[in-house]
From Swiss-Prot:
Name this protein carries in UniProt: Large ribosomal subunit protein uL5c
One Gene Ontology term, aspect cellular component: ribosome
Predominant subcellular localization, coarse grouping: plastid
Organism in which the protein naturally occurs: Phaeodactylum tricornutum (strain CCAP 1055/1)
Gene that produces this protein: rpl5
NCBIfam families linked: PRK00010.1
Lineage: Eukaryota, Sar, Stramenopiles, Ochrophyta, Bacillariophyta
Length: 238
């Protein structure tokens, strides 16, 4: 049952959700254009969030109907959307895998659901990770997309400790859209602009000061320091 404190936090989250979407439109585009004026002569080519993919591999355990059903329910609680069941494309005898065998779950979030999940991830979930030291810069791919792994589902506020039979994690892929199909850039430019975008959206990137020479990062840090951050105790301490 939600108490008054929880309701206040939920109201604050909805405000933060609106702020993230609005700040992207009025803030991140000028910063990226300022950082790469030649690259972004057309403002429609500025990278933006396209979708978030959440994946979980279950292996042969997916053949257990009850376990699969429980995992689907967890996905629905966390992502707010029913996941797709991923299946094997071919048989692999050495791993006892048959063709079209159920092996895991995957869900793709766009639009409002994407921003809702992103807000929860930034302001609730990361705060629940024990000894969290930030996100590695090495997890960017050549297109500026970011991939991260979470070791357990208990860090999400929708999951009750008593309902969990087995600790399982996720892989989260945050995909960017670079505007026009004619958009061309060096991989390093895409990665740097991806870093700037994620930093602006308050991702706790563990940059260790190496990127302070980029003026856009200083602008973002000053903007970030003015914002109010929600703080939650770890479930184990409540």
């Amino acid at each position: 049952m939600l108490n008054q404190h929880s309701l206040e936090e939920i109201a604050e989250i909805h405000n933060l959700l609106g702020n993230i979407k609005q700040e992207y439109e009025i803030g991140i585009k000028p910063l990226l254009i300022k950082n790469s004026p030649k690259l972004f002569k057309n403002p429609h080519t500025v990278p933006k969030l396209k979708k978030i993919q959440i994946n979980r591999g279950l292996g042969l355990a997916a053949q257990n109907t009850n376990l699969l059903k429980k995992n689907i329910e967890e996905f629905e609680k966390i992502a707010g959307q029913k996941p797709l069941i991923t299946r094997s494309k071919k048989a692999i005898a050495g791993f006892k895998i048959r063709e079209d065998m159920e092996l895991g779950l995957s869900v793709t979030l766009r639009g409002e659901k994407m921003y809702t999940f992103l807000t929860k991830l930034l302001f609730f979930t990361f705060a629940q990770i024990r000894d969290f030291r930030g996100l590695s810069l090495r997890s960017f791919d050549k297109a500026g997309n970011y991939t991260l792994g979470l070791k357990e589902q208990l860090i999400f506020p929708e999951i009750d400790y008593d309902d969990v039979d087995q600790i399982q994690g996720f892989t989260i892929n945050i995909i960017l859209e670079h505007g026009s199909p004619k958009y061309r850039a060096e991989s390093i430019d895409k990665i740097l602009n991806g870093m700037i975008l994620f930093k602006f959206l308050r991702f706790p990137l563990n940059d260790c000061g190496y990127y302070d020479k980029y003026e856009a990062f200083s602008d973002i840090n000053r903007n970030w320091d003015k914002k109010r951050h929600l703080k939650r105790k770890r479930w184990s301490q409540e």
